[in-house]
């Protein structure tokens, strides 16, 4: 391990002039000690006394030397190793398992740190892998510390850790943002307790090579004196910019690696390795194949061979052959000659990796990095709540991290596969996941942490204290989902957690829908182990069950043998077993349940028969069933985590164990199927879709639609899916289509609330009980367009009790809906549930409109709002440019008329219009189908048209100003 610049004098910046030539690590340790009471420092009174930001370039030792020297503040390095350390620990978080494990092992084996012994004074703690002392320097994934902050009290955290080092703090994963929110809140609470809390308050150090120091210092309220800049690598890195961009980065990466290999044939094996970044495993496999083919050409030319090592998170978790090859010394590795089949020494390793190798990982033999410049991450689009893996150009900060993998021990070379001009055009920093994905599974944690700071005990969006708050549309969608799931309710003072919400908020990582599905399982007397299995399958299989198959050519027919391995005994001897099971279940998730049951049966069989090496036999079983062994193990682990989560909050994870679907008989099977489907429906009711026979598409209440076809089940009328996925139409073009992830057919199994699923254009019909529209017309729809400042958010509209509605206009509340499922839900959830039936957010950038009912124009008063009238379904035809125009044109006295003038609706909308405008002379027999005709009417009412658009014969948009 090379000597980092933190240990070399003269690399400090942003420090007093007299300290610029200090050894950086000495200056940092002195700076910290000056603020510790045990070293003569004052008792901390503000965050500035407990937060330090170190921006240290790659290769400086911020991940290795810094944590060790910080730990030595607590334990003298000359202390005998046999003396057990009993003080508080230092935790250093890493964004990935690989870096946490590797750093701990490297430090434990380094001659530079003889006092750091793996398992005694240094260790690692990750979800899949753990080897750590009870007290000492602990490298952990961010998720480990996040879970502790979520479940432990402030005093418990303070008694465990003296220092928290957040390495790679620039990473903007949801968990890291939430962790920083927790840390800041904890520090503030302990400081508010005075000297009692402040004496043991942990010291927080944020480190990164590309951190935005201004943003983070502003967030923590600290000044420039709390920011230390350190120069990075000691050796130069030469960047080889290409003259032209490539349209096939995988092929170009292979050609570049081969060129490097041939032109540097005299490299020493200890200074020769190549690292190539790829956005995903599919690209890694393809590039590895090309490189292995290149090895064939090298063998024919009698040139030294390359050892190809594909690395991703799965390889690390399994510690497979490729990962072991990465950790081994090059002199101990061999490669098979494709011509002679003999093994020989490779000249170099070519490591083909995802972003797991992007940060914190030091490969001392690495000399070259090839970067195609792409990054793949999940993006979610609201309010449709559709998401998927999207490949985009990596931010400059990520590219700098990739470049920083070399130049640590000797000079390195960086080969971008894009021009310098392209690099200069891409964003400097990556977008935080809370922007690209929304709050997701951490939403309830955000709610709880925000409520803690609110004296009234309510959730207010403007009080969210995060580096970047959730976007308005994502926040609106999350609130809607939480209300529908019965976890949030709207009290007199604002949004509050329900009793179920309070329980759900204690889960460390369950989403709103996952928590709701578990709660429904207890109410409907379902086997909770089945619920946990279904949720685990959804999590691991991601888009569809075929992702569990270990085959390049995946299709549903290949699942047959795996599904049949787990079905109840009474179904095993029927003809056309899989086809009939598929028809009987009509459910991807239940088929996934049976796949896992088969895997469990295999585990029990091998254990009961006392076979040697159970894992080996399970791998062979999975190969026969064409299943990925790693995926099945992940389902097992995820399922165990869910059951543990339930047990931790006091719920019985083995509730109704005897009612498992796999143990059903002919009399109980369909009843248990219906029960599980009911739980799925209640969890994912916002993702219910009805079949439109005219359009041959499935449509939902949020206006989106998609096609779905099943070879056996023909066009079911109602389906539910855990999520809507964005799937690429082709590999050549940046185009995506919507498709369901997993499908559960509800027809005949669940009593679906059709009112809840009504599309927007049918909203007036939700007001059931109106037989004679002329005598008792439905109330018109009032729409509000809000301009949001920062994170200000509130639901528009009045409660149903305030709307003076006639009894016949109230929505019929079905017997099987939310309020009847869990008896302890507060009764005001009924009102909220009713409002959600007709309240949905639709936004473009900072614009949002909300649908609700109204009686008189004067009844509705909203700050920063513009009153709009019309049918919002037609607003789908407005472009972003149209909305931008409205954003600037509309004032508090402006109106947007959005009318869908299909035949038979004119009378209803004219009636609504004359009520809204107080103008009772509009002729109801007129056929208004053109913009000029409408303009004439509104001019008579004293309005001036300022914007208009007519996308079709029956749809038009007009903005009027009074």
Swiss-Prot record:
Catalytic function, reaction form: ATP + H2O = ADP + phosphate + H(+)
Keywords for this protein: ATP-binding, Helicase, Host membrane, Hydrolase, Late protein, Membrane, Nucleotide-binding, Transmembrane, Transmembrane helix, Virion
Binding site for ATP: 56-63
Entry's transmembrane regions: 521-541
First-level EC class: hydrolase
Annotated CDD domains: DEXHc_RHA-like (cd17917)
Record's note on what induces expression: Expressed in the late phase of the viral replicative cycle.
Protein name: Putative RNA helicase B962L
Species of the source: African swine fever virus (strain Badajoz 1971 Vero-adapted) (Ba71V)
Highest classification ranks of the organism: Viruses, Varidnaviria, Bamfordvirae, Nucleocytoviricota, Pokkesviricetes
């Amino acid at each position: 391990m090379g000597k980092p610049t933190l240990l070399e004098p003269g690399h400090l910046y942003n420090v007093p002039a007299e300290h610029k030539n200090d050894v950086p690590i000495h200056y940092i340790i002195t700076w910290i000690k000056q603020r510790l009471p045990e070293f003569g420092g004052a008792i901390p009174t503000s965050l500035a006394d407990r937060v330090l930001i170190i921006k240290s370039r790659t290769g400086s030792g911020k991940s290795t030397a810094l944590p060790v020297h910080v730990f030595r503040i607590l334990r003298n390095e000359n202390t005998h190793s046999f003396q057990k350390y009993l003080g508080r620990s230092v935790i250093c978080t890493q964004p990935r398992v690989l870096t946490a494990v590797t750093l701990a092992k490297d430090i434990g084996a380094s001659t530079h740190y003889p006092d750091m012994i793996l398992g005694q004074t240094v260790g690692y703690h990750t979800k899949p892998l753990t080897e750590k002392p009870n007290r000492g320097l602990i490298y952990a994934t961010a998720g480990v510390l996040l879970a502790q902050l979520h479940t432990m009290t402030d005093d418990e955290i303070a008694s465990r850790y003296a220092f928290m080092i957040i390495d790679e703090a620039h990473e903007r994963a949801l968990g890291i943002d939430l962790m920083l929110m927790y840390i800041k809140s904890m520090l503030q609470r302990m400081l508010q307790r005075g000297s009692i809390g402040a004496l043991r308050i942990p010291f927080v150090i944020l480190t990164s090579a590309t951190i935005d120091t201004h943003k983070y210092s502003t967030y923590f309220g600290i000044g420039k004196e709390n920011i230390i800049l350190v120069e990075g690598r000691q050796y130069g890195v030469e960047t080889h910019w290409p003259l032209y961009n490539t349209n096939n980065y995988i092929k170009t990466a292979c050609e570049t690696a081969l060129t490097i290999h041939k032109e540097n044939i005299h490299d020493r094996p200890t200074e020769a390795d190549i690292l190539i970044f790829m956005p995903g495993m599919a690209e890694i496999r393809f590039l590895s194949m090309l490189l292995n083919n290149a090895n064939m050409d090298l063998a024919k030319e009698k040139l030294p061979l390359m050892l190809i090592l594909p690395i991703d998170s799965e390889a690390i978790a399994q510690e497979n052959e490729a990962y072991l090859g990465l950790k081994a010394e090059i002199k101990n590795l061999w490669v098979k000659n494709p011509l002679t089949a003999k093994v020989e020494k490779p000249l170099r390793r070519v490591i083909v990796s995802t972003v797991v190798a992007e940060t914190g990982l030091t490969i001392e033999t690495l000399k070259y990095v090839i970067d195609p410049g792409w990054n793949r991450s999940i993006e979610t689009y609201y309010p449709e709540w559709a998401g998927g893996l999207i490949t985009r150009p990596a931010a400059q900060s990520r590219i700098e991290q990739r470049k920083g993998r070399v130049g640590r021990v000797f000079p390195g070379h960086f080969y971008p596969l894009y021009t310098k001009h392209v690099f200069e055009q891409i964003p400097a920093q990556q977008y935080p996941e809370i922007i690209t994905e929304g709050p997701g599974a951490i939403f309830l944690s955000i709610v709880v942490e925000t409520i803690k700071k609110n004296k009234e005990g309510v959730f207010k969006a403007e009080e969210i204290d995060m580096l970047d708050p959730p976007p308005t549309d994502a926040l609106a969608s999350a609130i809607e989902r939480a209300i529908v799931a019965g976890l949030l309710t709207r009290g007199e003072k604002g949004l509050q957690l329900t009793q179920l919400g309070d329980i759900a908020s204690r889960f460390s990582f369950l989403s709103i829908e996952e928590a709701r599905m578990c709660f429904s399982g207890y109410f409907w007397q379902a086997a909770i182990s089945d619920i946990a299995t279904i949720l685990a399958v959804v999590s691991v299989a991601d888009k569809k069950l075929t992702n569990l198959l270990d085959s390049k050519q995946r299709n549903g027919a290949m699942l047959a043998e795996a599904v049949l391995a787990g079905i109840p005994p009474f179904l095993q001897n029927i003809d056309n077993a899989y086809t009939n099971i598929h028809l009987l279940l009509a459910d991807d998730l239940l088929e996934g349940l049976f796949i896992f049951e088969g895997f469990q049966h295999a585990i029990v069989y091998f254990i009961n028969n006392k076979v040697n090496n159970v894992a080996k036999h399970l791998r062979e079983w999975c190969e026969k069933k064409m299943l990925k062994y790693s995926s099945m193990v992940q389902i097992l682990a995820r399922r165990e985590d869910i059951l543990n989560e339930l047990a931790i909050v006091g719920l019985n994870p083995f509730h109704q164990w005897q009612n498992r679907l796999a143990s059903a008989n002919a009399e109980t099977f369909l009843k248990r199927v219906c029960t599980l489907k009911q739980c799925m429906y209640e969890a994912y009711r916002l993702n219910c879709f009805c079949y439109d026979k005219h359009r041959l598409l499935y449509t939902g209440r949020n206006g989106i639609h998609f096609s779905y076809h099943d070879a056996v089940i023909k066009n079911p009328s109602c389906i539910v899916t855990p999520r809507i996925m964005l799937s690429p139409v082709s590999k050549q073009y940046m185009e995506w289509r919507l498709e369901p992830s997993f499908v559960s057919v509800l027809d005949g199994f669940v009593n679906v609330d059709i009112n809840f699923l009504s599309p927007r254009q049918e909203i007036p019909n939700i007001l059931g009980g109106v037989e004679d529209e002329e005598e008792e017309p439905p109330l018109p729809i009032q729409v509000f367009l809000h301009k949001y400042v920062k994170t200000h958010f509130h639901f528009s509209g009045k409660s149903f009790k305030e709307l003076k509605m006639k009894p016949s206009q109230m929505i019929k509340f079905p017997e099987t809906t939310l309020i009847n499922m869990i008896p302890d839900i507060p009764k005001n959830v009924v009102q909220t549930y009713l409002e959600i039936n007709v309240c949905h957010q639709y936004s473009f950038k900072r614009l949002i409109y909300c649908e609700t009912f109204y009686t008189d124009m004067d009844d509705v008063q909203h700050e920063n709002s513009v009153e709009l009238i019309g049918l919002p379904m037609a607003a789908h035809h407005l472009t972003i440019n149209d909305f931008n125009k409205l954003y600037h044109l509309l004032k508090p006295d402006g109106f947007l008329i959005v009318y869908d003038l299909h035949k038979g609706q004119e009378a209803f909308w004219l009636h609504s219009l004359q009520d809204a405008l107080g103008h009772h002379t509009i002729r109801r027999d007129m056929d208004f189908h053109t913009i000029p005709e409408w303009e004439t009417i509104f001019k008579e009412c004293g309005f001036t048209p300022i914007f208009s658009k007519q996308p079709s014969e029956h749809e038009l948009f007009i903005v009027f100003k009074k």
